[in-house]
Amino acid sequence: MTTLPPALEIRDLHKSYGALEVLNGVSFAAKPGDVVSLIGSSGSGKSTLLRCTNLLEYSQSGDVLFEGEAIDWKGEGHTRQPANAAQVTRIRTNLSMVFQQFNLWSHLSVLRNVMEAPVTVLKRDPGEVEEQARAYLSKVGLGDKCDAWPSELSGGQQQRAAIARALCMEPRALLLDEPTSALDPELEQEVVRVIQDLAREGRTMVIVTHDMKLARDVSDHVIFLHQGLIEEEGAPDTLFGAPKSERLRQFLSAVAA
């Protein structure tokens, strides 16, 4: 029986800004259908790790693999960059990212926001994309907002539209960077429910979050980052229920207060 490679794999990733080392040898893997949550204090390297995974930023050393395919690099250290632009474009289109700030185009309707990348980047048929975009907006509870402008939506609705936009690219994996942290608690739950639905469908996701309940409820694996290193990782029930690291115990106590 053939074993599928991980959907995403990070090997010994190092990333620094000048003398500040933000990631100091991080490795993890997400199997197809896995939900991996990255938790930790602000400044621990979570968002940087996600951006390096999607090649929005480049690491100084280490490997990024998508479905077993390693990124080709040229140069070393701070001059390192991908050697194959076509490879980067292809992999990025299969790794849709949802940001903390929704980043919807203010001059486009909600429907056009969701359609824009598949039509302009993937050169897909607009009629086919529109049908798909309407379906994804309905999926996230915004079927009646297709013709609305982003300014007419609440924060929770804008983030759900951003998730629909990411899904419309038909990615193999979703990367979500603090998708609920800019929202008040009531609006946050709108987005949490969508993420829970996606997890139940078996979507491969890597989520950076400060929401410990979300991480515990939807994750197959949770990684606690501290000062650019993986301090502890494991199944959510084990990591939250019986943390081994004193630093993790302190963190969980602080976020629960």
Label each residue range with its predicted role:
Residues G62-E76:
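Conserved ABC transporter NBD signature motif
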